[in-house]
Amino acid sequence: MNQVIKSFKNKHILVVGDSILDKTVLTRAIGISLESPTLKTREIEENISFGGASNVAKNVLALGAECTFLTLLGKDEYFKNYVELGKELNMMSTMSNRKNTVKSRYWVEKEDVRYKYLQINRGTSAPISENEFSELFSKFKKVLFSVDTVVFVDYDTGVFSNKNNISLMIKAANNAGKATIVNSQISDGENRYPRFAGATLFCMNKVEALSNYPLFTATDAGMKGLCNLLSTDVCVTLGDEGCIASISGTTIKIPANFVEPIDPTGAGDSFLAALSVSLPEQDFR
């Protein structure tokens, strides 16, 4: 295990995908409005951090690997946050006339207990234009031969809106001999994993596995059925039960390490980052 972790510093991961900013506003409950049944709070603090594909890139760096992050951005009032936060990510962005995606979560604290009261999602999922993709793909090909693994992170905000574009990127990576990992969120939309045919490995959660293969179970038979349907290797995260992976027909189930959860936001991104720096060794333990 220690040797695998030490090897991370020699890895260069290319993360391609949809950028998200996570805006967290922590408040304290102070009462109920007299005019309407509205909860009144006082702001304690506010912070903005990377989410989506940008959070995967951030976690790759935290593991000691080198990372290049390729994404599509809009030059709006949140662009400066990407510039500031993205300095360490070696971010290569293609500019677009779009609103950047921001997920604002409002937390209320009362008597040392915190709960999420409201989430507001902002941004657009407009398809990437032909000119935008041409610029993005040019940057993709330029950096491709210097990386070990390519990770496609799809949050359905535009980067992967065109199936033919996806095929071009996967084909280029395969021709360059690079492993490709795909994570495609389906919590707010359709199942888009079939668009990524030809990738090395799909990484998904149990809900996404069931969306692809309704007969899925976290067993050898369930994994083989899922892999046969998708024609690729698959790793499925199982929450507090760990994960199960099928690599070249061999199924491995790994229990989770016990931790005291504080906020599960971004847990999947962290797992994906760890998987990406481990994939060449195929040593998930």
Set out the residue ranges of the language-model regions:
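Structural recognition of alpha->loop->beta junctions
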Residues: L89, Y193-N212
